[in-house]
Regions:
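Metal- and O2-centered redox machinery and metal/ROS homeostasis
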Residues: 1-166
Length: 166
């Protein structure tokens, strides 16, 4: 969870810092932000001093550094990461939440906050709106290709995060 927190914090900070960019602005959606929920879960599992107990994750640090560079130099790239991370969370979140709840003996609240989106009452409609925002972006072919490249990077970076857990 600590590695995920580092990644989401970098993504969400980048989105907020670049919210004035016309391609980024439609994707600054705090209802999706996961860093606060991850902090709740980490406090539940590790206690009040959870921040001092996190072990560094090389894969998370590489991913977060990449997101920081995008925020500084190529903010539209953040959109691809928002798409892959958040739509993945919304799509598989319920199944993963149920599995985590059974494995951890939890029913709701702290420990499972990452999987809950209380500000999104209709997940399917929200996902459709997110995709519509993406489809409406005025992208050149080169810009669209750059977003695809970033989405592929996001998948590879996520795989590296999970490989560290194995």
């Amino acid at each position: 969870l600590g590695g995920l927190l580092r990644v989401y914090a970098a993504l969400e900070d980048g989105l907020l810092r670049r919210r004035g960019h016309p391609l980024v602005a439609p994707f600054v959606l705090p209802a999706l932000f996961r860093a606060p929920a991850l902090a709740v879960d980490l406090a539940h599992f590790l206690g009040p001093a959870w921040q001092s107990r996190l072990a560094p994750s090389p894969a998370a640090e590489r991913y977060a550094a990449h997101l920081d560079r995008l925020a500084a130099d190529a903010p539209p790239g953040l959109v691809a990461h928002a798409y892959t991370r958040y739509l993945g969370d919304l799509s598989g979140g319920r199944l993963l939440r149920d599995r985590a709840a059974r494995a951890l003996g939890l029913s709701e609240g702290p420990g499972l906050a990452f999987y809950d989106f209380p500000a999104i009452p209709d997940i399917a409609a929200f996902k459709a709106d997110f995709r519509a925002r993406l489809d409406a972006l005025p992208l050149t072919d080169a810009a669209a290709a750059a977003l695809v490249d970033e989405a592929n990077f996001a998948f590879a970076a996520s795989a590296a995060l999970f490989a560290e857990l194995a």
